[in-house]
């Protein structure tokens, strides 16, 4: 499963189309995004909702809550899939190694602690 934010992070510096809920579209290169899916585009072509007006802008900032959908190149989707698979493989390797479990892990020996913490007092 690919999370939308990881897809957006990978799509930085790639072209994308952003359609808003009101029908307007922004075509440009993704410069940055945040956890609310607010998007900063550069080299943007804005198209009005009826499609008869076009504006070229050096940059645009789109609020995440107004976005209807994003169109991202297939190559970016493939990049994300390979990154996700690599992270999974790395996590499996770490789990199979075993960390701190079994003999000799954290916590030390649970036997008699010598003169520490016993009842009675000093002799």
Swiss-Prot record:
Quaternary structure, from the entry: Component of the precatalytic spliceosome (spliceosome B complex). Component of the U4/U6-U5 tri-snRNP complex, a building block of the precatalytic spliceosome (spliceosome B complex). LSM2, LSM3, LSM4, LSM5, LSM6, LSM7 and LSM8 form a heptameric, ring-shaped subcomplex (the LSM2-8 complex) that is part of the U4/U6-U5 tri-snRNP complex and the precatalytic spliceosome.
Keywords, alphabetical: mRNA processing, mRNA splicing, Nucleus, Ribonucleoprotein, RNA-binding, Spliceosome
One term of GO molecular function: U6 snRNA binding
Source organism of this protein record: Caenorhabditis elegans
UniProt feature, compositional bias: Basic and acidic residues: 85-97
SMART domains listed in its UniProt record: Sm (SM00651)
Highest taxon of the lineage: Eukaryota
Function: Plays a role in pre-mRNA splicing as component of the U4/U6-U5 tri-snRNP complex that is involved in spliceosome assembly, and as component of the precatalytic spliceosome (spliceosome B complex). The heptameric LSM2-8 complex binds specifically to the 3'-terminal U-tract of U6 snRNA.
Region (Disordered): 85-123
Feature: compositional bias, Gly residues: 98-123
Family: Belongs to the snRNP Sm proteins family.
Domain Sm: 3-76
Cellular component GO terms held in the UniProt record: cytoplasm; nucleus; P-body; spliceosomal tri-snRNP complex; U2-type precatalytic spliceosome; U4/U6 x U5 tri-snRNP complex; U6 snRNP
GO BP field: mRNA splicing, via spliceosome; nuclear-transcribed mRNA catabolic process; P-body assembly; spliceosomal snRNP assembly
Gene: lsm-4
Cellular compartment(s): Nucleus
The protein's name in its UniProt record: Probable U6 snRNA-associated Sm-like protein LSm4
């Amino acid at each position: 499963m690919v999370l939308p934010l990881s897809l957006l992070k990978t799509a930085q510096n790639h072209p994308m189309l952003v359609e808003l809920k009101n029908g307007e579209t922004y075509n440009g290169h993704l410069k940055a995004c945040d956890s609310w899916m607010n998007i900063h585009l550069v080299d943007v072509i804005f198209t009005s909702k009826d499609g008869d007006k076009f504006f070229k802008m050096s940059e645009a900032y789109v609020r995440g809550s107004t976005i209807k959908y994003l169109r991202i190149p297939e190559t970016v989707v493939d990049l994300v899939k390979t990154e996700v698979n690599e992270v999974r493989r790395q996590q499996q390797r770490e789990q199979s190694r075993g960390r701190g479990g079994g003999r000799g892990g954290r916590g030390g020996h649970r036997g008699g602690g010598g003169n520490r913490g016993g009842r009675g007092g000093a002799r």
